[in-house]
């Protein structure tokens, strides 16, 4: 009888034993949390500070972010000073030594990526909001997405060695799907190779390089500087003279100036989402490109 009781007790304890504790991953962008979810699976729990419909340069720091950071095992950032305006004080106030920049629980996703527009001269405020270490919108190139995924897999394996086989398997699946999707995206964009475009902000050099587009100008006169009447006239003249068919505008910018330019030219306004979560349909890193490329292709076909 006692033997049966102890067997029952042992079985009960095994059933009641807590499952593997999930790694708490906080990211500054939903793009990184999407990739971390794909790699980590049910071994991670993710939270993104900036939502996909928000300007990642300007994030309102909330007390809830400090709480999330205080419990985080891993913090994934874009780096290149994209988060310089809000993140350092949040990290300090979290009092979590695991996620400081010199700690194992901190991952700069830009490392190893193809970073464009690294300044070759001293950066001054007269140049606008120029990032001194290069353009931080690097995740808009699928090749960089693969680099980011590999870095996340390596970091998760470092923090959770028992999950390495899971992370490696999920990484292989992610890379395989990304390769297949990229073939599809490149095929859709191929008819528009070398097309000239105008963008509101300088967010798309990596996207343009990968998909062979030429960014001819920006609606902002300088990065972070609102459109002016004189510069708007210059853009109108540029679009007319170069027969530029499309303007890419992020969802958090005022459409007043782009729409005005559209009335004076044949260029179409195309709302382009720089991050996962920009709309409900953009649920992950793959659907981010699906949505933007379909919107671009439809606009270009309509401009003919």
What spans do the regions from the language model cover?
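Bacterial N-terminal signal peptides
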Residues: 5-16
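Extracytoplasmic metal-acquisition and chelation regions
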Residues: 21-304
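N-terminal secretory signal peptides that target proteins for export/translocation
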Residues: 1-3
């Amino acid at each position: 009888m006692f033997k049966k009781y102890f067997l029952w007790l042992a079985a009960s304890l095994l059933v009641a034993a807590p499952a593997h504790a999930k790694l708490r991953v906080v990211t500054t962008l939903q793009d990184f949390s999407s990739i971390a979810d794909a790699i980590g699976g049910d071994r991670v729990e993710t939270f993104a500070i900036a939502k996909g419909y928000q300007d990642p340069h300007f994030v309102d720091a909330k007390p809830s972010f400090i709480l999330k950071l205080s419990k985080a095992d891993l913090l994934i950032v874009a780096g290149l000073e994209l988060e310089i305006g809000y993140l350092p004080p949040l990290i300090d106030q979290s009092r979590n030594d695991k996620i400081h920049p010199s700690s194992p629980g901190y991952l700069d996703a830009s490392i190893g990526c193809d970073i464009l527009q690294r300044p070759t001269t001293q950066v001054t405020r007269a140049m606008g909001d120029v990032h001194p270490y290069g353009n931080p919108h690097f995740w808009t190139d699928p090749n960089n997405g693969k680099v980011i995924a590999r870095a996340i897999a390596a970091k998760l394996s470092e923090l959770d060695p028992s999950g390495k086989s899971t992370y490696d398997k999920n990484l292989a699946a992610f890379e395989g799907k990304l390769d297949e999707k990229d073939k599809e995206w490149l095929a859709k964009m191929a008819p528009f190779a070398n097309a000239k475009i105008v963008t509101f902000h300088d967010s798309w050099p990596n996207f343009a390089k990968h998909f062979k587009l030429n960014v001819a100008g920006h609606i902002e006169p300088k990065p972070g500087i609102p459109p002016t009447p004189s510069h708007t006239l210059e853009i109108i003249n540029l679009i007319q003279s170069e027969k530029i068919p499309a303007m890419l505008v992020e969802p958090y910018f005022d459409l007043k100036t782009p729409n005005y330019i559209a009335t004076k030219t044949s260029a179409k306004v195309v709302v382009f989402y720089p991050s996962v979560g920009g709309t409900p349909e953009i649920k992950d890193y793959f659907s981010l490109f699906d949505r933007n490329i379909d919107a671009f292709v439809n606009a270009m076909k309509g401009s003919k």
